[in-house]
């Protein structure tokens, strides 16, 4: 497992490689929720999401002679770009194995950062594919089930508490659970009274199913439009941290995530992806837990949505 010291070490390790993203208040959202609402704008991070924090912490933790032939990863979304970018910055080649249905903007951006992209029919096959690269001397970077990756993601939590010491609630979306595990570890370590709320969209609910079953559950398919939340399962490690730190996980329909995306664009002037906008949809469902004295942070984890998808989702 990992702890606050690991997250603080990660921050020093990745300093200068990533941005400290803004935490801004929203008068409009505060009025609508009946509580003080703040937006952690991680969509302004390099590569458009938080993922680069974990990717850098992983690769920079490895001595140069232990980095192998390069980096290899499985991703149908933001982790792909993060690993490709991190590899390019430290002078390593990268191979990203992606499902064939990955949106074109993700594939193009990943190639734009210098990675070789290998397309496979299903994400389950992608994980089998990288085993071949590992045996051939490549270093794999798991999207969530790695303490070094989680510690890197947890630096978001450090920034939240430093910028808003009296934070009462943090709302974070969940894919495989590594991001919320890191953020929750940082937030709860620095401010034990703060509450961390998880969010998933219907059709990408691996953590909700795991919490109900008491163990990780393999999803047959990802049917949500929030593709970047589309982990086929969580891990034993991320499940344990969710059980330890989270108040609950709220399940949000795609329609509510898209309605929230539109509102954030129109009123907060930020273009998120559904995996981020779902935090606002969840906050509205959780409003009975908040009061006028609540200081609620919505973590807008990414903004990598194509114009094509945006138009399609709105029609």
Q: Language-model segments: which ranges?
A:
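PLP-dependent amino-acid enzyme catalytic core
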Residues: 1-315
């Amino acid at each position: 497992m990992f702890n606050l010291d690991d997250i603080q070490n990660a921050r020093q390790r990745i300093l200068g490689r990533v941005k400290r993203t803004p935490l801004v208040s929203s008068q409009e959202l505060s009025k609508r929720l009946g509580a003080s609402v703040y937006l952690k704008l991680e969509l302004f991070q390099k590569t458009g999401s938080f993922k680069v924090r974990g990717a850098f912490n992983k690769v920079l933790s490895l001595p140069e002679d232990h980095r192998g032939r390069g980096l290899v990863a499985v991703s149908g979304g933001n982790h792909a770009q993060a690993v490709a970018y991190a590899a390019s910055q430290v002078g390593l080649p990268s191979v990203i194995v992606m499902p064939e249905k990955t949106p074109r903007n993700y594939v193009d951006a990943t190639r734009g950062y210098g990675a070789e992209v290998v397309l496979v029919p299903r994400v389950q096959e992608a994980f089998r594919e990288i085993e071949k690269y590992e045996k051939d001397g490549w270093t794999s970077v798991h999207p969530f089930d790695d303490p070094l990756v989680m510690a890197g993601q947890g630096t978001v939590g450090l920034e939240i508490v430093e910028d808003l010491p009296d934070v009462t609630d943090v709302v974070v979306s969940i894919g495989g659970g590594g991001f919320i595990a890191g953020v929750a570890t940082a937030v709860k370590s620095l401010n034990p009274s703060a509450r961390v709320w998880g969010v998933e969209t219907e059709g990408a609910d691996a953590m909700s199913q795991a919490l109900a079953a008491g163990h990780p559950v393999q999803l047959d398919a990802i049917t949500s439009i929030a593709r970047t939340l589309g982990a086929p399962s969580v891990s034993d490690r991320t499940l344990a941290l969710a059980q330890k730190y989270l108040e609950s996980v709220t399940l949000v329909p795609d329609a509510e995530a898209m309605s929230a995306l539109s509102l954030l664009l129109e009123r907060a002037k930020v273009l998120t992806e559904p995996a981020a906008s779902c935090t606002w949809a969840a906050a509205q469902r959780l409003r009975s837990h908040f009061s006028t004295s609540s200081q609620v942070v919505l973590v807008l984890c990414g903004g990598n949505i194509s114009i094509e998808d945006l138009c399609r989702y709105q029609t």
